[in-house]
Regions:
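Short hydrophobic alpha-helical segments that form membrane-spanning helices or hydrophobic packing faces
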Residues: 159-166
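An N-terminal alpha-helical hairpin/helix-loop-helix interaction module that forms a charged
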Residues: 1-152, 168-248, 252-254, 258, ...
């Protein structure tokens, strides 16, 4: 299965890394992105002016509960402002999105610690390095910054979502849908479920997160699943969870089973996935 957003997201993440030590210029560019499409910059600080920002919060600007039309408009403006060569996507299958009311990865100025945003940049940089070359040194560097960020204000499962956005073939997203899907023996091997279930009851530390992602990839490589990588898994988890939610609606309405047209729709989507 092809995910056209991956090339754009990966290239944009690499572009953002060059602004790690030049955030004033980055903030100017973000303001320009919104000005070009006549949209208001979302509230990212206690006042109206952006003081500082991290790369995952920037990704969150177009990965939250907004319309696809607005998402495409923002991404298109980003492409022009940052010189992104990858095609601007118009399909976003397999992408987890943030709650609009919890869309920053940091607390506002009076609530966050001095190094909070710097720490997020550091785990962002370490994640890209680890995705580029998976070795012990890069794992240690990633783990150091991940564990620092893990305990910061406003960091929840969104940390795993951010890692997935920037390098989706290297990092697993552990949003609620994926956690639900991964811990069901109908979807993953029983030994995998037993090994990871207790590790994802709450946001895992770096060692547990790396264990979950590595164990998942091993299971996908060794099993005969329709999903062979994290993006396919994420998409499939979304698709099946939507099916289950719809079944619950029908049951509450007094139906014994889904209407035939819905069965056919699910069957078609399963074969596509």
């Amino acid at each position: 299965m092809q995910f056209e957003w991956i090339n754009f997201y990966s290239e944009f993440a690499s572009k953002l890394l060059s602004f790690k030590n030049d955030r004033k210029s980055l903030i100017s560019k973000i303001n320009a992105v919104y000005a070009a499409i006549d949209m208001k910059v979302p509230k990212l600080e206690s006042g109206d002016e952006i003081i500082d920002i991290d790369p995952f919060t920037i990704f969150g600007l177009f990965n939250k509960g907004i319309t696809n039309a607005n998402r495409i408009a923002i991404i298109g403006s980003i492409a022009k402002e940052f010189g992104i060569e990858a095609k601007v996507p118009d399909n976003f299958d397999g992408i987890p999105v943030l709650n609009n009311l919890k869309a920053t990865f940091y607390g506002f100025k009076d609530d966050r610690k001095e190094d909070d945003i710097d720490n997020i940049w550091n785990v962002f940089e370490a994640a890209i390095a680890l995705a580029d070359e998976d070795n012990e040194a890069n794992r240690a560097e990633f783990s150091k910054w991940y564990d620092l960020v893990h305990d910061q204000l406003c960091i929840r499962w969104n940390l795993t979502m951010g890692l997935y956005w920037i390098r989706p073939y290297s990092f697993i997203n552990l949003d609620s849908r994926n956690r639900w899907y991964l811990t069901n023996v109908e979807n993953m091997p029983a030994e995998f479920v037993d090994a990871v279930k207790s590790k994802i009851n709450k946001l895992p530390n770096a060692a547990d997160y790396l264990f979950v992602k590595d164990s998942c990839m091993t299971a996908l490589n060794e099993g005969s699943y329709e999903y062979k990588n994290y993006p396919e898994l994420s998409y499939y988890a979304w698709m099946i969870s939507e099916q289950v939610n719809q079944e619950d609606v029908y049951k509450r309405q007094g139906y014994n089973e889904r209407p035939a047209y819905w069965k056919n729709k699910i069957s078609i989507r399963r074969s596509y996935a």
